[in-house]
Amino acid sequence: MTKKKSPVISFEDFSFQYRAQKKPTLTGINLNIYPGEKVLIAGPSGSGKSTLAGCINGLNPFSNPGESTGKLIVDGVDAMQSSIFELSAHVGTVLQDPDGQFIGLTVGEDIAFALENSCTPQDKMHEITKHAAELVGIEHHLDYAPHELSGGQKQRVSLAGVMVDEVKILLFDEPLANLDPAAGKQAIELIDEIQKKTDTTVLIIEHRLEDVLWRNVDRIVLVNDGTILADLTPDKLLSTNLLRDNGIREPLYITAMRYAGIDITKEKKPAHADSVVLDESDQKKLRNWFSAQPFSPKEPEGAVSYTHLRAHETELHL
């Protein structure tokens, strides 16, 4: 019988209230994250997802004062009783604004910052820095200044900077916030590649769900009003109405399927457009729906774009 792994992150009846607020931002959180998992934590603005992340990496309560109840264990340590410095040895965080993490004058200096603080010998420091840069594909930019880099390249530098500590947990706080869709896909590909190479536990805090699902995740944890509403596989979550009901835009191909009258179930494997299982009846419904839509070059602002929906027709193998 295979022994079940112990969670690397464990919330037990955990609540957190910022000192400046009258009521808790997080209430009754129970959640286990296991070693090697890649988990998306999704929720609308103000849902509590960033507060959840801040409790994991130590920003709460050490940079943002507040009180907690319950228990939060991160890689074997009590997060609420540990210093932010101690937690940084377990959790590496890449912020949505990588400019806020730059410290060195060059890419190489920035990646090596934590090594300098720990008095790593020069030869070892160069070796580790080079390896981290190669791992994220930024090795040819070590002499560049931060302002010479694109948004995606800055994110790679931030990632390399936290990986030199060989942390077990990587936390990405809205990594797509400042990236266009193409750069966003590259970022998700990089995160997926790093996770596979290192077997690191990865948490992605993000509301751009379709972009994150460009690569597989093990689970999606849906947060709203400071509580966990769902902890499901992508296939199971996308077969519900929970995303729409909580202000998260579901993937556009899912919207197209719903408009066409298709019953979306987990058995149809809806997590990725190119792997959706559609029988002949479903395919006919989609073709008929696409054919019946008049093309309108002027679509209402904020509406689901028919043009974008149409772009998924090929992905759905129609």
Q: Can you describe what each PLM-predicted range is?
A:
Residues 145-149, 153:
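Conserved ABC ATPase signature
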